């Protein structure tokens, strides 16, 4: 079973962002190719029975919701691709969505860590938690590498030099 891999999301996002304007791929199609991990988590939830079944089903629903949110982020990226590449309009909104996505990933990682002590699920959740944490770090790296509009100077616009 393949655990949630945030690097797939970043690969899709980067492919959309770096494509020439005339060849921007459809992020929904890319998401269908890459974002299968929510379904894998749902399958995991169906496989287990016992006391944790309801918790696992709740996690699977969260994963599906998370996958839908990521697809929405990709759709927003498609709509604003030229502005995002140039660092102008759309950047703040996209950055905000990515930050919320990273925050959700982090919270899910904490939840997975809390279930590690359960002997039956410990190894599975340890692996999922590690994937979530790695994904959160990758999202933060991506946010750090996004283009920024010009940084305003402290003393206002540049003044012409005096001779």
Please identify what each model-predicted range represents:
Residues 1-163:
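Non-heme di-metal
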């Amino acid at each position: 079973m393949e655990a949630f891999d945030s690097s797939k999301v970043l690969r899709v996002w980067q492919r959309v962002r770096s494509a020439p304007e005339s060849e921007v791929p459809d992020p929904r199609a890319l998401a269908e190719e890459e974002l299968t991990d929510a379904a894998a988590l749902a399958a995991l939830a169906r496989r287990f029975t016992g006391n944790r079944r309801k918790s696992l089903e709740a996690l699977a629903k969260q994963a599906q919701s998370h996958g839908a949110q990521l697809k929405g982020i990709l759709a927003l990226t498609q709509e604003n691709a030229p502005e995002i590449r140039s660092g102008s309009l759309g950047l703040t909104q996209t950055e905000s969505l990515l930050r919320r996505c990273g925050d959700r990933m982090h919270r899910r990682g904490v939840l997975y860590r809390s279930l590690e002590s359960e002997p039956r699920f410990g190894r599975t959740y340890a692996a999922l938690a590690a994937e979530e944490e790695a994904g959160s770090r990758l999202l933060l790296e991506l946010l750090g590498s996004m283009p920024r509009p010009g940084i305003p100077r402290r003393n206002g616009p540049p003044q012409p030099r005096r001779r």
